[in-house]
Design a protein with these regions (language model features):
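Contiguous, well-ordered beta-strand patches that form the walls/edges
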Residues: 83-137
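Bacterial Sec-dependent N-terminal signal peptides
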Residues: 16-47, 167-169
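Short, low-complexity, Pro/Ser/Thr/Gly-rich segments in the mature regions of secreted, periplasmic
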Residues: 160-171
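Small side chains
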Residues: 12, 18, 53, 84-85, ...
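N-terminal glycine/threonine-rich, aromatic-flanked beta-hairpin/loop signature
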Residues: 61-105, 142-149
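Short, exposed beta-strand-loop hairpins at the edges of beta-sheets
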Residues: 138-158
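Short, solvent-exposed loop/hinge segments that bridge or flank secondary-structure elements
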Residues: 36-82, 115-130
Length: 171
């Protein structure tokens, strides 16, 4: 009888240990994987230009859902940097210099991240944005735009679409 009690206690311990080791982090310190920009720093996007258009959602992860299956999107390019986006990691304030664009072949990409609590730009903040795009004439083909947050349940949305040039320097 004593050996049965020991076995039951041992199994109970294993179950409790397994439950306590389960990673169920709801603090926002983890999150969804968002790619970083790749390639060399872009040197050919020196002219100021603004592009706008509609991006359509192609993927969604996470318990929280913005419900945005499409969105109006603006992208500002100047001095090899981008501003714009939907969540603010690319937006910044009036004195925000923009996010560095990188180039690999004919594709451009940019990544930015910030902490929503204090607005500081850090490498692994709770708000992340990534964009990969090509430019042909007055058109930007957004291969993927990824927006991710880790607060309020968190989510990661991926969008793609086409943007058209709306202004440039001197217009």
């Amino acid at each position: 009888m004593k050996s049965k009690q020991i076995i039951i206690m041992f199994l109970s311990f294993i179950i409790l240990f397994a439950i306590s080791c389960k990673n169920d982090d709801k603090t926002g310190s983890s999150g969804y994987s968002v790619p970083k920009a790749t390639g060399d720093k872009a040197t050919d996007l020196t002219t100021q230009a603004e592009y706008s258009g509609t991006l359509n959602r192609t993927a969604h992860e996470g318990p929280s859902d913005t419900g945005l299956t499409s969105m109006e999107f603006q992208l500002f390019i100047e001095n090899n940097k981008v501003k714009g986006g939907a969540l603010g990691a690319f937006a910044g304030g009036a004195d925000f210099p923009g996010t560095q664009v990188y180039k690999s072949g004919s594709e451009y990409s940019a990544y930015s991240s910030y902490n929503s609590a204090d607005g500081s730009y850090v490498d692994e903040g709770d708000v992340k944005e990534y964009i990969k795009f090509t430019i042909s004439g007055n058109t930007v083909n957004v291969i993927e735009y990824i927006a991710s947050v880790t607060y309020d349940g968190g989510y990661k949305d991926t969008y793609s679409g086409t943007l058209t040039k709306t202004t440039s320097a001197g217009s």
